[in-house]
A protein has these predicted regions:
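Conserved acetyl-CoA-binding loop-helix of GNAT-fold acetyltransferases
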Residues: 60-63, 69-82, 105-109
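Conserved acetyl-CoA binding element of GNAT-fold acetyltransferases
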Residues: 54-65, 94, 122
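Glycine-rich acetyl-CoA-binding "A-motif" of GNAT/NAT acetyltransferases
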Residues: 39-45, 102, 115
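Conserved beta-strand-loop-alpha-helix junction that forms the acyl-donor binding cleft
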Residues: 68, 94-103, 122-125
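Conserved beta-strand in the GNAT
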Residues: 42-50, 57-62
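Active-site rim helix/loop that mediates acceptor-substrate recognition in acyltransferases
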Residues: 12-40
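Conserved GNAT acetyl-CoA-binding A-motif
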Residues: 77, 84-96
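Short amphipathic alpha-helix that is part of the acyltransferase structural core
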Residues: 1-15, 38, 118
């Protein structure tokens, strides 16, 4: 999954997010992840998210270019959303790079909107 995500510049990965880190995330009970495969068994899409109390997050979503605009991303988001809703998540959030216009259009089409009056603060641990 990590190798698949790293193929796409628009998927935000920090240097510290390596395969070991991803394996640690995947075994957590609060993680939701799905893969989409083509008929040859190759990964063509992936989503990774998590649950934080009553909120959920999509950390990464990627779809191979030749499979975009075919509903793969939408189905991956719906699967992750269903997992979260089933365990009581009431709201989902995600981060999109300011320069990722296609990503902004995709997430808007999925019903997400930019919050007003909020700013994200982060720090490395």
């Amino acid at each position: 999954m990590e190798r698949f995500f790293r193929q796409f510049d628009e998927v935000s990965f920090c240097e510290w997010q390596d395969a070991k880190c991803l394996r640690g995330v995947l075994i957590q009970k609060t993680t939701t992840s799905y893969l989409a495969f083509d008929i040859a068994g190759e990964i063509v899409g992936a989503v990774l998210g998590g649950m934080l109390g009553s909120r959920g997050t999509i950390n990464h979503l990627a779809v191979s270019p030749r499979y975009r605009s075919q509903g793969v991303g939408q189905r991956l988001v719906e699967a992750a959303s269903s997992d979260m809703k089933r365990v009581g998540v009431l709201r989902m959030f995600l981060f999109v790079d300011d320069a990722n216009l296609a990503g902004k259009r995709f997430w808007t089409a999925q019903g997400f909107c930019e919050p007003h009056g909020e700013r994200t603060f982060e720090r490395d641990l």
